UniProtKB/Swiss-Prot annotation:
Its cofactor is pyruvate. Binds 1 pyruvoyl group covalently per subunit. The gene is pdaD. The lineage of its organism: Archaea, Methanobacteriati, Methanobacteriota, Methanomada group, Methanopyri. HAMAP family: PvlArgDC. This is Pyruvoyl-dependent arginine decarboxylase. Belongs to the PdaD family. The modification Pyruvic acid (Ser) is found at S42. It is an enzyme of class 4 (lyase). Gene3D superfamilies: Pyruvoyl-Dependent Histidine Decarboxylase, subunit B (3.50.20.10). GO terms for molecular function: arginine decarboxylase activity. InterPro entries: Pyr-dep_his/arg-deCO2ase (IPR016104), Pyr-dep_his/arg-deCO2ase_sand (IPR016105), Pyruvoyl-dep_arg_deCO2ase (IPR002724). GO terms for biological process: arginine catabolic process.
């Protein structure tokens, strides 16, 4: 696999009577429910451009950094992308049975610390979040992701 040229920030929520089905519903809501996601760590290529999520053929192998929270109460997730002066991007994923404000704050703090460890300054910070709690089912899920392709 080469260096991805494009990425999209996506999020979704779902609920169901099982934890797995709630997670599946959240992936569907985020537009990536029919993909085989390959988990990545926390680096956004320097020249990657943000774009709208394409329609991947069902079963596509798609690289992504994913934050997922699944539970029987409030669940929240956040992806935070920080762009450094060098152009490199760093990604933090946070998920918890807590408020969206809490996971966003923690994800931003992660990115600030990751920049500090590299001796660089952040020039841009973007977040995508999801938060929900079950209303009509036993389980809820919140997913936030940065998806790569190209």
């Amino acid at each position: 696999m080469g260096v991805p040229k494009k990425y999209a920030l996506v999020s979704g929520t779902g609920e169901a009577d099982t934890s797995l089905a709630a997670f599946d519903a959240a992936l569907i809501d985020a537009g990536i429910g029919d993909c085989n996601l390959v988990e990545l760590s926390s680096i956004l290529p320097p020249n990657a451009e943000e774009d709208d999520l394409p329609e991947f053929p069902p079963g596509s192998i798609v690289p992504a950094v994913v934050a997922k929270a699944v539970g029987r109460g409030l669940v929240s997730s956040c992806i935070c992308v920080g762009r450094l002066e060098s152009g490199l991007g760093i990604v933090s994923e946070r998920a918890a049975t807590d408020s969206v404000e809490t996971v966003r704050r923690l994800a931003k703090r992660d990115v600030e610390e990751m920049a500090r460890l590299r001796g660089e300054k952040l020039v841009e910070v973007r977040t995508v979040t999801a938060s929900t709690e079950p209303e009509d089912a036993e389980w809820a899920a919140a997913v936030a992701a940065v998806v790569f392709w190209g």
